[in-house]
A protein has these predicted regions:
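Glycine-rich loop(s) and the adjacent beta-strand/alpha-helix scaffold that form part
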Residues: 1-50
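Surface beta-loop-beta hairpin patches that serve as ligand-binding interfaces in beta-rich domains
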Residues: 242
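FAD-dependent oxidoreductase catalytic-site/capping-region signature
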Residues: 26-29, 42-239
Length: 242
């Protein structure tokens, strides 16, 4: 039985999309090399067990930073992570059999919006989720710009020259923003920051008020990232806990 029908529940779905260009390199060992070598895996394990050092002592990303896609912006709108590994489809395919790294890029203020809807009263049935990533001109333009920023850093900075980087994905010959966004989107992944499907506010399209009580109901509160009016310009875990 439906107690309260609110059309905005499940709307306004917002997430951070992680673009994953890949650069093949030389003269440097990456996690790809360790993954396919029994001896290197043993050494890596011993380093961690005995000294708490090595690749197992850090997370999947070795560095993180924020930057502007346009210098005229007041605050950074891109988040970068550097991972010393590469694969085609994250979580679905093995690491590449050559040394490479992945400088991931995330537009932390996307304008694309998706939806999540129930398909059945049975809660065991998975919902219908439509993310609509890169569905706006602005998001595609920023995606293209962000790929170019990474490309410029990797291919033109002195720090990377000893490793002779080669852009495998999306491809050095792709230069226009629209095509870059399309190609990068083929290998992109969520960074697991879905928010805003039960948006907080006082307007008629808001789902909860500033006390997190659902509009039209007195005994239901929603306390998770779905109540965020807008996605945060960074990771969502800490703001949710706060």
């Amino acid at each position: 039985e439906v107690v309260k029908d609110h059309s905005s529940v499940g709307a306004n779905l917002t997430d951070h999309l992680m673009l994953r260009p890949v650069y093949k390199i030389k003269n440097l060992e990456t996690l790809n090399d360790i993954y396919y070598s029994i001896s290197k895996k043993i050494i890596t394990g011993l380093k961690f067990l005995l000294f708490r050092k090595g690749p197992l002592a850090v997370g999947a990303s070795y560095g993180c930073g924020f930057i502007k896609s346009d210098p005229h912006l007041e605050t950074p709108n891109l988040q970068f992570h550097i991972s010393p590994a590469s694969t085609d489809l994250l979580g679905k395919s093995s690491l590449h059999k050559f040394p490479a790294f992945t400088p991931t890029i995330t537009n932390v203020r996307p304008t694309s919006r998706g939806t999540i809807e129930i398909k059945s009263p049975d809660t065991r049935v998975s919902p219908k989720i439509k993310m609509n990533y890169l569905s706006t001109d602005e998001d595609r333009d920023i995606a293209g710009k962000s790929i170019k920023i990474v490309r410029n850093i990797v291919m033109n900075s002195n720090a990377y020259k000893p490793y002779e980087p080669e852009e495998l994905r999306p491809g050095i010959n792709i230069t226009d923003n629209e095509t870059l966004a399309i190609e990068a989107g083929k290998f992109a992944n969520t960074i697991f920051h879905p928010v805003s499907t039960c948006r907080m506010g006082n307007d008629e399209k808001a789902v909860v008020n500033d006390r997190l009580v659902a509009h039209g109901l007195s005994n239901l509160r929603i306390v998770d990232a779905s109540v965020m009016p807008h996605i945060t310009s960074g990771n969502t875990n800490a703001p949710t806990i706060m």
